[in-house]
Structures are given as C-alpha cells and as structure tokens.
Amino acid sequence: MATVIHSPRDPNTLSNYNNWVSTHITATFDILFEQKKLVGNVVHKLKSITDARSTEIILDTNHVDIGDVKVDGQASHWELLPPLEPYGAALKINLDQGVGLNEMVEVEISVKTTEKCTALQWLTPAQTSNRKHPYMFSQCQAIHARSIFPCQDTPDVKSTIDFNITSPLPVVASGLPVRGIIEKAQPGSKTLYQFHQKLPIPSYLFALASGDISEAAIGPRSVVATSPDKLSECQWELKADTENFIHAIEKIVYPYAWGEYNVLILPPSFPYGGMENPIFTFATPSIISKDRENVDVIAHELAHSWSGNLVTNASWEHFWLNEGWTTYLERRVSLHGEAYRHFSAIIGWKSLADSVEHFGHDHPFTKLVTDLKGKDPDDAFSSIPYEKGFNFLFHLENLLAKDKFDRFIPHYFTKFKGKSLDSYEFKATMLEFFQHDLEASNLLKNVDWDAWFYAPGLPPKPQFDTSLVDVVYELSSKWKSLPDSSFQPRTSDIEGLTANQIVVLLEQILLFERPLTPELSRVLGEVYSLAKSENIEVSNLYFQVGLRAGDDTVYKPTAELLGKIGRMKFVRPLYRNLQKVNRPLAIETFEKNKDFYHPICRAMVEKDLFGKREE
C-alpha cells in the first residue's frame, strides 16, 4: 500500500513533520546567568511516517547556535537554510537513506541560545521582587521554542520530554520533578535538576524557570512557587480555591491527568496573565491582589490541563479550540454560581468588543478561524479566540440545552486526548455525536458554521443574566449624567461591590461618548479609593479613565505602573491611551522600561507606539 504524505496543516512551521514526528525529546541544558544563555544539547527520537521516502529531517530554528549534529550516533551533514521571517531558519539534516514506516531515528544536536532568543527572558536581580538573584524564564507560545532548540515547533506534534537542567538557582520545568533522586551537585556550586513529562506535549509547552524560588503547599496535589519574600501572600491568595477548581473541572470533563498541579508566580515582567505550562502554570504576580478576586486566572490556566494541553489546536489558525474551550470551562467552574458565569461572560464580551474595535470590524484577525500563512501568530493575539470561541460554545450549549451539551464535553475530550485537531474535526465530531438525536441533529445542521468560523467582527450577542451588572450599570448611568445632574458620589455607592464589579463600572465609564472631565475623574479616584488600589485590574482601568479624561494627575502614576508590570493586557492599552494625551511621556516611559519587558511584550508595544520599525 502506498504511503500518503499529507501536506502539513500548520503554516507557521518550516519543519517536515508530515514526514517525521518527534516522539520524545531529551533536553540537557546548563543555565549560564552571566552570559544569558542556555548551553547543552537536545536529542529527538523521530518516527518515520513515510516508507523510506524522506532522506532529510527539517526542524525549526530561530537565532540558535548549532554545534554538531549526530544521527544515530554518527556525525551528520546539516545546513541552515536561508531565514524565512518570521519563522526563522530551517535546519536541514541529511540522512544516508530513508527508513521504513514507523521506524525510529535519533538526532542529537548541540546548541546554545543567543541574545536574539525570543523565548527567554533574563532578569537582573533589580528586576525581581527581593532584588537578590538573577532570574530566567521561558515563554514559548506561540512559535518561540525554536529560539531555544531545534524542534518541530508546531502544536500538531507532541512529544514526551526529559529535562536535565543545571543551574546555580532552583529550577522548575513543565514536567514532574524526578523525586527520589538527590539533586546532584555540579562543579561551581551548581545543581542538576531533573524533570520528566510522561504525557506527550507540543513544543510551545516546553517551559523552564530558574531563580530564587521557594515552594509552599496550596492543596493536596499543588504547591505555589515564588520568591521567598512573596511566598506567604501567594500561598494565602491561592490555597482557598485551587483544589476546589480542580474538583469542579474534573466533574465536567474527567480526572486530572498530570499528577501535580502547581503554580509559579513569576516576577512582574511576565507578559501574560498566565501560561498553561503543564505541571507548573506560570502566572503573573498581578493576580496576587490580596483580595482573592483575580484567581480566575488560575481557573483558566488549570482548565488548559484539559483544553489545550491534552486536546490541542492543530495550528494557531484554530487557536479558539484552545482558548475558547478553556474560557468556557473556566466559567463553568461553579464555585460562584450561574449568575457569576454570566457576569464573567459580560466582562468577556466587553473585551471582545474592544479587540474587534482595535483591529477593525472587517479585519481578518477578528475571525474565529484565521489565515496565518506568512504571518506571525503573535500579531493575531487578542481576546477574540478566547471570547468569540467562548460565545460559540455558549451558543451551542444554549441551542442544545446544557444537559445534552454536557454529555458531549467528556466525549470530545476523550476522543482527542493526546491529539491535535482543527475546527473541521470539532464540527464533524459534534455532528457525529448527536447524529441519532433527531432534535439536536436538526438544530446543529441549522447552525451557520461558516459564519461562526469565517465571518469577521462580533458574533450574535447572547442573552446574558445581567443581575450582577445591573447595579453597576445603574451607578455608571449616574456618573454619565454628570455634571448635569444632582448626583453626588459617595463611598457608600460601592459598598458590597466586588472588585470585578468595579472593573465593569470602570469599563462602562470608558464607553461614555463624552469622557469624564478631569475634575470628575479625580473625584472618581478619590471617593472610591481607586488610585491606590492594589488590584491592578482596577487601578489600570482607573488610569485609562483618567487618561481619556485628560486628567494629568494620572499621567505619572500610569508611567510608574508601566515600570512595575509587564502583563500585555495592562501594558498595551495603557501605552495606547498615554500616547494620545502625552506621547513624549509614553515614549520616555517605554525607552526607560523596554529592557524590563519580555521580548514579546516589547515587540508588541513597539508596534503600538511606532508601527513596524527596524531593530
């Protein structure tokens, strides 16, 4: 029987993963803080998926130094092909001959990272919370693993991984710590840390961090890891909810598969809210708000343990299968009740509307299924796959009724466990699952799948339960009536409101066609104590209200906040709004802090402030 070679369905990789699939990776690295480099080697076990028809292995790389390459222990001829931006330079490894279908070859590559590595951020002691030691962490999503080591940098390929990491400081990785071995002391007061990831994962979930890290329990199968000076407050913030979150999602899908669920609270320059690295979620310190109001980030990253990490989008064009499902599961965590789920969805709708407004209503990146051929997936990053994806699943749930949709959820996550899929397989699976239920089958056949997948702009807005926002809407309408009404703001206006309700209030005020006056903006901050809030979700929105109002008393605090946090959710809108009222301050603030930001964040802000400029 002839071997069928399928064309790869991921346009953002240069690898020939349609000929070879990496099944296991052994990554051995020495962390060199002084040189800001990882040095070591990576071994790929690759399975042939043709019958001796491929005599070359092509891997993704981007700005890595390659030493030698061995195939099955023998030195091999290799070359770096000309760079194809933004994807890097493909590494072509020649084989003497092809190998049979399903036979294995072992490729060992010695490698060093360079200063152009986009996956690693190196922090000076001054950039950490206790200012004592340097720190390093990785962020490989979407296509940055290739800047650490040559790999098939696509979510359509999954490998088990062994990590052997030597560092002078504690290490965490996206594998289970190999316990029962004594961490081995190395020359120069370094220690070897070993981790094993027994479940196959895509390259974007390869993760490392090293620094002054301590751990404390937050549940029977969970620890929080962070800087020692922040450990107790992080433990308090997370210990009340983490195990409850795990139980809640297990009831909806099936038991947690990864053994431990741990959370690493990173230094403040981490660019995302969280990154769902298996075993160790990497999370921003902005969730530590001292009121347990922002732990939904943990619910979201935990939900990725099923959607994304076990069942994965086959390419970044179908990113909603990761993020839409995860947002859906996060909101199904019923610790707060159904009204809160709708409340969270209303906040999400506002975020979706903002993203559509930012790109433009007919922009291709506002589609659920995007075309990323020749594009950098980071450029398409926004709330759209999260919130448009959530709203599609929420629409299907309401269409079918929750009890029927709930029967589909574990079926879907079982069928694709350990696999990657695209939107068309999702659709086919749903239609097939309900084919013997005439009512459900007819309802699904009448869904305008093409409009959901390919229409740009906002989807149809669902009927949300507005009970938790009605009180906020009422208060925002009073603010809207100023200065023409007799409304006098008082502290009692917000008594009993959660921080997330304050977020909605501020978002409503940002929607006013006529911004607040500078004087009213100051009253808002003073009477409701918003300017001093330790909850960045609140303070960043208050600053945006002030910037829109032209209230110059928030300009300096905005610039100060931009020097303390690197989460793009806050950084990008604050820069966009600051530059509208004081562009010199925005540019000065960016130039002062650009080395503090993660390379991904820095590149995005540069585009926001300057358009595409050369390095």
UniProtKB/Swiss-Prot annotation:
Zn(2+) binds at H300, H304, E323. It is an enzyme of class 3 (hydrolase). It is found in: Cytoplasm; Nucleus. InterPro entries: Aminopeptidase_N-like_N, Aminopeptidase_N-like_N_sf, ARM-type_fold, LTA4H, LTA4H_cat, M1_LTA-4_hydro/amino_C_sf, M1_LTA4H, Peptidase_M1. It comes from Aspergillus oryzae (strain ATCC 42149 / RIB 40). A peptide binds at Q139, C140, Q141, P271, Y272, G273, G274, M275, E276. Aminopeptidase that preferentially cleaves di- and tripeptides. Also has low epoxide hydrolase activity (in vitro). Can hydrolyze the epoxide leukotriene LTA(4) but it forms preferentially 5,6-dihydroxy-7,9,11,14-eicosatetraenoic acid rather than the cytokine leukotriene B(4) as the product compared to the homologous mammalian enzyme (in vitro). Its EC number is 3.4.11.-, 3.3.2.10. This is Leucine aminopeptidase 2. GO terms for cellular component: cytosol; fungal-type vacuole lumen; multivesicular body; nucleus; NVT complex. The keyword Zinc applies. It comes from the Eukaryota. One of its GO terms (biological process) is peptide catabolic process. The keyword Nucleus applies. Keywords: Cytoplasm, Hydrolase, Metal-binding, Metalloprotease, Nucleus, Protease, Zinc. Belongs to the peptidase M1 family.
